[in-house]
Amino acid sequence: MLPLADLRFLMFVDDVYEDLELWYPKLRLIEAGAHVVVAGPKAGEKYAGKHGYPCVSDAAIADMEAADFHGIVIPGGFMPDKLRRDPKVLRLTREFAEFGKPTAAICHGGWIPISAGVYRGVRVTGSPGIKDDLINAGAIWEDAPVVVDRHFVSSRKPDDLPAFCRAIIDVTTRR
């Protein structure tokens, strides 16, 4: 049996997402048996990654509910800087964190949990470019390929994706 069989994960997408940070976790979760829903500002819309790779959203963020999913994965790129201004994105992220569901962010994806106010006192990593933002939000910064603190999983950059995905699967299967 696959470790994530019949579990559902939410991922966010918008223009200028980091291509590998969306596609690698999405495919790894699917390989592990999960159903992944990629939600953007509009359902069925094509969004372009930083390197031009397209992603068509499965659903609109406005239609998503944290109760319908087992975890969330937030890719980086410049997309999180746009989506962190969306109250629905922040509410969803807060709910995943408050429900104790796997809440994973890589690179600049940490901007969304920062704006959602869920990183205070949490050990995390992220892109060195947002280190000060993480610390100022009350997070405990660690420079490591992956940091796991309870149900929170974070990584720094695309090179960390193998460790990031292993940690997401591990945290999910321990629940």
List the predicted regions and their residue ranges.
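Extended, subdomain-level signal for the structured scaffold at the beginning of enzyme domains
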Residues: M1-F99, T103, I112-R123, K131-R175
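Catalytic nucleophile serine of serine hydrolases
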Residues: C107
